[in-house]
A protein has these predicted regions:
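Compact, glycine-rich, soluble single-domain proteins
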Residues: 9-44
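Short glycine-rich, polar/acidic loop-and-turn segments at beta strand-coil junctions
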Residues: 40, 49, 66-68
């Protein structure tokens, strides 16, 4: 299991478009569980409506947890996604 912390820096936070892109990326890792947590709430990254329910805004601190056989690849791609989009 791997994880990383990230502070959202995008003024729009994780809006619908960015959440959709993240969900699409997470769905590529069918055998790996990717979870995004904000405070005491968490959602699987491949579930769009649950991710939107986290209401991630600019300045929020999130924790991304990756568990499965493709966790190293997923970690690299997800970290790049967050740095490029959020």
């Amino acid at each position: 299991m791997l994880q990383f912390n990230y502070t959202v820096q995008n003024p729009l936070g994780m809006d619908f478009r960015r959440t959709g892109l993240l969900t699409k990326l997470a769905k590529r890792y069918t055998d790996t569980t990717i979870t995004v947590a904000k405070g005491n709430q968490a959602a699987k990254a491949n579930q769009l409506t649950r991710m939107m329910g986290l209401s991630i805004k600019n300045g929020d601190k999130i924790v991304v947890t990756i568990d499965g056989p493709a966790e190293n690849s997923a970690l690299f791609n997800l970290r790049s996604f967050f740095e490029d989009n959020l």
